[in-house]
Structure formats: C-alpha cells, structure tokens
Amino acid sequence: AFHYAQLADVDSNAQAFLKSNMQAKYVKDCGIMCRHYKRAQQQQMNMKQWIK
C-alpha cells in the first residue's frame, strides 16, 4: 500500500486510493482475497506439487 500510495503523482487510481477513507479496508480485503486464492491453488495440487 505504501509503494502504491507513492504513485499518486502519476497514477489516478493511486490518487483515488489516497483520497479514500477506506484504505485499511481495501488492504484487508486484498489480503483476504490473496489467502483465498492461495488456498484454492493449494487444493488443486497434490502435496508434492505444492511443496515444489
């Protein structure tokens, strides 16, 4: 989030993120979605593939 916020000078989406009062929620939701994605990925693999 910090590096994204630094792009506010050149990126209009980053600028909108900085102006939002829901930054913490967006970061939290992103973390949750990453966990869901990793879990789904893991469920499609066997143990050997996951460890590799």
UniProtKB/Swiss-Prot annotation:
Q: Which residues form the signal peptide?
A: none
Record family assignment: Belongs to the papillomaviridae E1 protein family.
Listed under GO cellular component are: host cell nucleus
InterPro entries reported for this sequence:
P-loop_NTPase (IPR027417), PPV_DNA_helicase_E1_C (IPR001177), Znf_lg_T-Ag_D1_dom_sf (IPR037102)
Q: Where in the cell is it found?
A: Host nucleus
Please state what the protein is called: Replication protein E1
The membrane-spanning stretches of this chain are: none
Keyword Aminoacyl-tRNA synthetase set for record: no
Give the GO biological process terms: DNA replication
